[in-house]
Amino acid sequence: MILSPSLSLPSCASSCSSSQSQFNFKSKSLSLNRKRSVPHKLRNLKCAPTENTPVTRKLDSQSNMTISLHRDEDEENPPPLLDSETTTRPRRIALFVEPSPFSYVSGYKNRFQNFIKCLREMGDEVMVVTTHEGVPEEFYGAKLIGSRSFPCPWYQKVPLSLALSPRIISEVARFKPDIIHASSPGIMVFGALIIAKLLCVPIVMSYHTHVPVYIPRYTFAWLVKPMWMIIKFLHTAADLTLVPSAAIARDLLAAQAAAANKIRLWNKGVDSDSFNPRFRCHEMRVRLSNGEPEKPLIVHVGRLGVEKSLDFLKSVMDRLPEARIAFVGDGPYRQDLEKMFAGTRAVFTGMLGGEELSQAYASGDVFIMPSESETLGLVVLEAMSSGLPVVAARAGGIPDIIPAEQEGKTGYLYTPGDIEDCMAQLMPLLNDRELRERIGKLAREEMEKYDWKAATKKIRNEQYSAAIWFWRKKRSQFLRPFQWLAKRIFPSPELNL
């Protein structure tokens, strides 16, 4: 595959179809490998792939991004229509998830729990290998295996595990997976990769935590480059990479961490029944507002970590003496935040779940998200599904949830770190009940389009099938020299006739 910095393409009679929607890249010229590079400005193009014309890769996103790639024999894509028998028959899927989606507080907790649930409802056999703490005895019939873990050196509350003990290798081998799916980055993904190679099984990696962005906040900035090298090693070894947002896809491409035709979007999903305006509750509002339910109430839900830029909210609240703020969630930064907000009317509820969490979302006036490092921002989806207007930083995966054409309709975005811009978006909502209700209603309607079952079906049927196709192609290319040699050593009898 060859990419040129400036493309002038002939018109095409037909357009190539893809299950992915468009990204609009605006980045400098990048090299994806020795044979290809990403142009500094890629245009939205539709063309039928031929021998000499480019292939247009599309990734599902509300932001328009198109990767225009010249096709050669080494960079083909799977056929758009796959054998229905292979996509509908039950599959055996081994998931390697670190930290545990059952106990660790993070954005992907709901994603993986719903994913496992939906896979089981589709009739698939699922094995989950994860860190040992908090692993339940049963979860929708999936086979659960805990691997002994240790705390991350610079983030003690994050458990890590290689998951490469003889016991786990034996368990996975007996399970006979059709495909292995590992969360990335981390330590366990290395174990998953080794096991996939040992068992000759395709491996999909899904990228969930943008570690290079977090590193300067927790440890030494010089570790960013080595971290990107590790990510590149992992994802170039994977048969397919799943990302939660277009922004993360752009970052991986910019770092040459994966080939463009092997990056696919894991569609967003939200449980619109659990996160619903009907859960609005006066008692919960009294609790969140510190006994003053008549005051404007701002809600933030999520893990309380230093990388979430939550100190920015102190500057916001200093300008809103009449408003109240509630932090729903827990994390290593909680004590610092409590000291920071000492003497104010801020409320820290700790972890909430189930109906209490649904009530917390639905009982606020505005949801605020200052984080600049979200790979997607599932709490933003949950807030919008609850009918809560959102004000969030225009960074990370958030613009994929509230794209430019939807700003002011389904939510508001502000320039990261810009207090004036944030206040300009926040104040009208706090002062105008009708505006809050209108934005909340439109946000709810938008979120009703996204369903976990549909997102899971797309991964299972389309993306897993694509990974298997890439794996088989790579395997056949690897075996080709040996097949050629075998023909020379053991010539076919028919050829001698």
Where are the model-predicted features located?
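A short, active-site helix/loop in glycosyltransferases that binds the activated sugar's phosphate group
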Residues: 228, 236-265, 270-274, 336
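Nucleotide-activated donor-binding/catalytic signature segment of Leloir-type glycosyltransferases, i.e.
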Residues: 335-356
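N-terminal subdomain of nucleotide-sugar transferases
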Residues: 2-148, 452, 474-497
